[in-house]
Amino acid sequence: MNVLEIQNVSKEYGNKKALNSVSIEVKEGRIFGLLGPNGAGKTTLIRIINQITAPDKGEILFSGEKFKRKHIQNIGYLPEERGLYKSMKVGEQCLYLAQLKGLPKNEAKQKIHHWFKKLNMMGWLNKKVEELSKGMAQKVQFVSTVIHQPKLIILDEPFTGFDPINSEIIKNEIIALKENGSTIILSTHRMESVEELCDDIALVNSGECILNGTVEEIKQNFKEHIFEVKYKGQLKGNIQHFETLSSSEGYAVFKAQDKEYTHTLIKQLVEQVDVISFNEKLPTINDVFIQSISNE
């Protein structure tokens, strides 16, 4: 089932097309990576999903229903631009935001206690936001985003301000949220996070969706038939129909001249050496990103 369906959505600001007939589907219980260079249209799309602005054309469905104001209660949004009130105490801030999302006061207090204890934040409750470091404030905003257990969570650059330890903590919390049934849209320039977390991705450039699918499908579509081999013995000569990209004792990387020859590599190798391991090298999402944008 799709939690979110964006169908041919367009948005213009004056003469500039921020989005041009964009269509994507976000499946329930998965992490969806929304990728693109600066100015590609990602922020405009996120604002439309949050009903901060409206599309000029197109339609949005939420769990199969036409997207309405009531659905905002089922969305948690962590914006790239931080929005905490600096003079408020942290606990009061979280309580206020939780109640805005429809949680009764007592339930909100219980959930704040749960999350603050879980993330080792109990000592922050009576601090003012302005007393917090950037990373501490980011943790508070993350809790405020997920506290009402929204069906759809939108995280725009969620790792900004975090050291490696806290980045890992938040990454694990994102995985736990998915395992507990939440659907997550992750917008980030950290391609290693996309590799680790995302099931599906869409790549937006110049207001258009130029790539859309599962991470595995996209990697398969962009693969260049490159193989890494570890072996024992001595390679006696060139491998027919393959270019040797790199080679050292007991290790080599080969690229097929054409995909029709890929099945012949292992056969040629075992005639010369004892093969220890044989792996096809798939492109990283960073490779896919750079190639796709460069080709536009």
Where on the chain are the PLM-derived regions?
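ABC transporter nucleotide-binding domain
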Residues: 172-256
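Conserved ABC ATPase "signature" region
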Residues: 95, 99, 107-124
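Helix-to-loop junction immediately C-terminal to a conserved catalytic motif
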Residues: 50
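Short, charged/small-residue-rich alpha-helical element at the C-terminal edge
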Residues: 224-296
